[in-house]
């Protein structure tokens, strides 16, 4: 299929989605907890959406926020503990937890705290490169933070969204996710990218499987996670 035909299929799909689903709100991650860096908040939520869905991510984030005091505490959780907080049957829970913990740890090392607010003032290309270079961060997560937290031009894709688009012949089925993201960002104007992504997430919301509501989260902890002091400023 030619690039022109592929573009036609993409725009036809987006046109149909506008009639079938309501796009998610740009702020569907919810407001960050008081005192929390909003970019870090979007980073954590983006990890939960990756290869899952927005409803699953929202539920998991609620459980995590009940169980820990702040996002810095997530950094010192063990991966299995983090995975249990996400909820029973959460997709790729252990891998997701391992990646999230690695990313938060590297943010802490680079910034001397769990904060990414300085990315707001960086050129968007530099901010995206920073996020993509963090250990454990999938391209989807970096692109989503750039799009929704930093106001940059990006069309986040993971394997699930890529497969959905490929089934509609809206992206090259044999290409990589990186290639598809690049093509989408060249094909859609900057002002179109946010709506397109939010439509795709609303579409995924209808298709994604649900997981059980239970999790291994206990009452909110006040001082320690698995024997580590929450207030410590040293590396785990």
Give residue ranges: language-model regions.
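N-terminal polyanion-binding entry modules of DNA glycosylases/AP lyases
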Residues: 1-121, 189-236
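Catalytic DNA-binding helix-loop module of base-excision-repair DNA glycosylases/AP lyases
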Residues: 43, 48, 100, 123-169
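Short helix-capping and hinge/turn segments at secondary-structure transitions, especially at repeat
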Residues: 22, 66-69, 105-113, 132, ...
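Short leucine-rich amphipathic alpha-helical surface patches
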Residues: 21, 149, 165-172, 187-188, ...
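A general structural motif at alpha-helix termini
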Residues: 61, 75-78, 86, 123, ...
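Short, structured loop/turn "capping" segments at alpha-beta junctions
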Residues: 110-114, 139-144, 155-157, 172-175, ...
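Short, charged, surface-exposed loops that flank catalytic or proteolytic processing sites
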Residues: 69-70, 116, 171-179
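Short amphipathic alpha-helical surface patches that serve as generic macromolecular interface elements
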Residues: 158-165, 177-185, 193-200
């Amino acid at each position: 299929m030619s690039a022109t035909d592929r573009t036609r299929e993409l725009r036809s799909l987006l046109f149909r989605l506008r009639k079938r689903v309501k796009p998610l709100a740009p702020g569907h991650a919810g407001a960050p907890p008081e005192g929390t860096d909003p970019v870090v908040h979007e980073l954590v939520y983006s990890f939960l959406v990756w290869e899952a869905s927005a409803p699953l991510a929202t539920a998991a984030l609620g459980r995590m926020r009940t169980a820990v005091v702040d996002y810095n505490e997530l950094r010192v959780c063990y991966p299995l503990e983090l995975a249990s907080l996400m909820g029973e049957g959460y997709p790729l829970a252990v891998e997701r937890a391992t990646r999230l913990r690695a990313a938060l740890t590297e943010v802490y090392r680079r910034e001397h705290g769990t904060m990414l607010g300085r990315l707001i003032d960086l050129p968007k290309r530099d901010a995206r490169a920073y996020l993509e270079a963090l250990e454990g961060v999938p391209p989807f997560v970096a692109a989503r933070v750039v799009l929704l937290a930093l106001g940059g031009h990006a069309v986040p894709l993971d394997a699930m969204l890529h497969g959905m688009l490929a089934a509609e012949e809206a992206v090259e089925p044999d290409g990589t996710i990186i290639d598809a993201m690049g093509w989408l960002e060249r094909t859609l104007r900057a002002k179109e990218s946010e709506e397109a992504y939010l439509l795709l997430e609303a579409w995924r919301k209808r298709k994604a499987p649900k997981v059980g509501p239970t999790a291994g989260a206990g009452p909110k902890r006040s001082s320690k996670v698995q024997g580590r002091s929450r207030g410590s400023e040293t590396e785990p």
